[in-house]
Design a protein with these regions (language model features):
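Extended alpha-helical targeting/anchoring segments
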Residues: 1-271
Length: 271
């Protein structure tokens, strides 16, 4: 799915909401939740089985600190040194959906229903514009990215080890039963992250891949795991937990598979 020319963008950081659309920029000191809900209510597309699952809507990211708006009494305790927004969403009413298996592409333009005839003609014009982009535009020449400094972790090995020990103590005390520890790496970067994303698609095609650009922020990733998917009013999750290296032969593969299926920890992550 490719969305472009967003109809609006809503973002928030530390209760400062910013909405950008055709009317300009509006700012509010508030939780973003009510505004996001209102956007979802105002922009709904009818279900059409002939079209892909996604035909337009909000696309973007929610940061971990977004929990402050959805969990009463929760305020993040960690130091905000990355300066990411708590949420950044764009509303796309024009979408190109590629079906790589069938080798086809859907050109989708949404329209409002208050003036159906005029809006239908406008949607048709948008589709013709998309067709022209695909047929006539030359591929963009992207500058090959380059690291201008070495990758530097936020925590060294000793500090990370201390975090693991502390997490184990919290588990023993019953404060938590599971935790995901992470270590951010930073480096000076020059070039386009979209180039990196294209290489990622080529080298490691995955079920869940994304590229998102907003202002001076670019996000890209690839994962074999789709955390959650909404379809026909039902939520689907495809958790992956536990890995083992491949064996030297089929017999060793079967042994490792049996070990994985009987591992108490790995089984717990699926329940």
């Amino acid at each position: 799915f490719v969305g472009y020319d967003p109809k609006l963008e809503i973002s928030c950081r530390n209760y400062e909401v910013k909405i950008t659309d055709a009317f300009g920029v509006r700012r509010f000191s508030s939780s973003p939740q009510k505004y996001i809900r209102q956007i979802l209510e105002d922009y709904r597309s009818p279900k059409n089985d002939a079209l892909p699952d996604f035909t337009g809507g909000l696309v973007g990211f929610f940061g971990y600190d977004y929990a402050r708006y959805s969990v009463k009494g929760f305020e993040p305790q960690s130091q905000d040194d990355a300066h990411f927004k708590d949420v950044d969403l764009m509303l796309f009413d024009k979408v190109l959906a590629f079906d790589n298996k069938k080798g086809t592409v859907f050109l989708i333009a949404n329209m409002r229903t208050d003036e159906p005839q005029a809006n239908y003609k406008a949607a048709c014009r948008e589709i013709e514009i998309m067709r022209g982009i695909l047929e006539n535009d030359k591929p963009a020449r992207l500058k090959k990215p380059c690291l201008k400094s070495a990758m530097k972790p936020l925590f060294d090995a000793d500090q990370y080890g201390e975090m693991v020990l502390k997490a184990k103590e919290h588990i023993k005390e019953g404060d938590i039963f599971q935790v995901v520890l992470s270590n951010r790496y930073e480096a000076e970067f020059e070039g386009s992250l979209f180039y990196t994303y294209r290489e990622l698609c080529r080298l490691n095609p995955s079920p869940y891949m994304f590229y998102f650009s907003s202002g001076d922020i670019e996000l890209a990733g690839a994962s074999p795991e789709t955390l959650v998917k909404l379809k026909d009013g039902r939520l689907f999750t495809y958790p992956l937990a536990g890995t083992r290296k491949r064996g030297a032969d089929e017999s060793e593969d079967e042994k490792l598979q049996k070990e994985l299926l009987e591992d108490e920890k790995e089984l717990a992550e699926h329940n």
